[in-house]
Design a protein with these regions (language model features):
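Regulatory and interdomain segments flanking nucleotide-handling catalytic cores
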Residues: 1-128
């Protein structure tokens, strides 16, 4: 099992990427996330692979760090599952963990955090 976080920086165009991107890089590095396990794509979207036990911690950490910058926020989905194809680029990898993260991200609407796992009962408890 793996955890996949798919995230999007809210109001990223209002703040210089030098500020939020460097903060994001430093935060992930300090949290011990290897650079090969995460990627920024489409300018302000992020995807990272982690152990399931670390996924919620990293999600909360990214949220807390992002909220330190005025007018900035982050919306994210955490997917738990297998990774059946691992590419050099995180965004080109695939499997149920990525699918769960993508499905949860697409369903966010006005929410800023959702979790989707193989266990429906678990999802219902976490997604209040």
């Amino acid at each position: 099992m793996e955890g996949v976080i798919t995230a999007d920086i809210i109001n990223s165009r209002e703040v210089s990427p030098d500020i939020w991107l460097n903060l994001l890089k430093d935060t992930l590095q300090n949290a011990g996330v290897e650079h090969s396990s995460w990627e920024v794509y489409r300018g302000d979207s992020i995807q990272l692979i982690t152990k399931p036990i670390n996924a919620l911690y990293l999600g909360i950490l990214l949220k807390a760090v992002t909220k330190q910058i005025p007018n900035l926020d982050i919306r994210m989905a955490i997917g738990i599952g297998e990774i059946t194809y691992r590419s050099e680029k995180v965004s080109s990898s695939n499997g149920p963990a990525f699918i769960n993260s993508g499905v949860a991200f697409d369903a966010l609407n006005k929410k800023t955090l959702a979790i989707k796992t193989p266990w429906k009962d678990f999802d219902e408890v976490l997604n209040i």
